[in-house]
Amino acid sequence: MTPTIKPGQDFPGVGVGLAILRDGRLLLCRRLKAPEAGYWNIPGGKVDHLESSLAAARREAEEETGLTIGKVEFLCHSEYINVADRHHWVSLIFVTRDTQGEPVLTEPDKLSDIGWFDPDNLPEPISA
């Protein structure tokens, strides 16, 4: 039997996030699953094999929020390492101000809440 190899645990995983801005506010989702359970974060997730990071950011954000995402630009990268839990992720972060629709909680098995927040008054706990 071949052992299961998991990205982010057995080797560094590649993730993406999309900072969605509208009217001076940032859209955040509250996660239900480890390693960020209970934390607020921008929409995002794993990059699928043979998928570009930009396409993954758009896909994950549309899946998690129900929004239609327009123009997306690269913003920065982040790295999460938790030795105790054996988690290691490198994430590419993108930004957009180009969306249509209103956000809805489309993945209640992964997210417990979604909302717009003033960048000077973000909810806690928040994930980097």
Language model regions located:
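Short Pro/Gly-enriched beta-strand edge/turn motifs at strand-loop
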Residues: 1-4, 75-77
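Conserved N-terminal beta-strand and adjoining loop/helix that marks the start
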Residues: 3-26, 93-95
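A generic structural micro-feature
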Residues: 8-12, 39, 84-90, 108-111
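Short loop segments at secondary-structure junctions
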Residues: 23-25, 32, 97-102, 119-121
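Conserved Nudix-box catalytic region and its N-terminal flanking loop in Nudix hydrolases
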Residues: 25-63
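A short coil-to-beta-strand element that immediately follows conserved catalytic motifs
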Residues: 68-76
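Active-site-adjacent beta-strand/loop module that shapes the phosphate/pyrophosphate-binding cleft
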Residues: 78-103
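NUDIX/MutT-family hydrolases
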Residues: 93-95, 104-128
